[in-house]
């Protein structure tokens, strides 16, 4: 896992130079949004179960996927879907705090699309649920923090598509 600070420093270090103006601006922007990110993470942590529940209700609950023959029909499949959405929310929150999506590649996306395809998990429905989670989260944390979290939800969706 990498954070925004490490990314900036590593980029300069690889080139064997001091931090330039652009690197310093990236660090300033990261630190300027620190309190916003911490407050958002606190709200998300306190409301994680409800965020997932509302996202499922908005996107999946009354669709064909939950009816007999659908991919979320059995209780076990439904529970696995809820577990996965909670996992995405948690790791998107970590990425938002770090200001860097690398943890999403390392811990979420590597091999996920292939695994879902082999298990018959509908990727379009998963992306739809993640987008619903993005909306629910933004409504709780506010526009600025919601926009920041949206970057990482979108990153997951892109990785699945």
From Swiss-Prot:
Membrane topology term: Peripheral membrane protein
GO biological process: photosynthesis
Coiled coil: none
UniProt keyword list: Antenna complex, Bile pigment, Chromophore, Electron transport, Membrane, Methylation, Photosynthesis, Phycobilisome, Thylakoid, Transport
Pfam families xref list: Phycobilisome
GO CC entries: phycobilisome; plasma membrane-derived thylakoid membrane
Locations listed in the record: Cellular thylakoid membrane
Record protein name field: Allophycocyanin beta chain
Gene: apcB
């Amino acid at each position: 896992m990498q954070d925004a600070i490490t990314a900036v420093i590593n980029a300069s270090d690889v080139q064997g130079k001091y931090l330039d103006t652009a690197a310093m601006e990236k660090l300033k922007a990261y630190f300027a949004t620190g309190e916003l990110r911490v407050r958002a993470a606190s709200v998300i942590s306190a409301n994680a179960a409800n965020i997932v529940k509302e996202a499922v209700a908005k996107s999946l609950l009354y669709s064909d996927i939950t009816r007999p023959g659908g991919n979320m029909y059995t209780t076990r499949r439904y529970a696995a879907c809820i577990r996965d959405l909670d996992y995405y929310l948690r790791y998107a929150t970590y990425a938002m705090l770090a200001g860097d999506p690398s943890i999403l590649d390392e811990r979420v996306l590597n091999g996920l699309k292939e695994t879902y395809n082999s298990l018959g998990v509908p990727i379009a429905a998963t992306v739809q649920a993640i987008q619903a989670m993005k909306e629910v989260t933004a409504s709780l944390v506010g526009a600025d923090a919601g926009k920041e979290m949206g970057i990482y939800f979108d990153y997951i969706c892109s990785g699945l598509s």
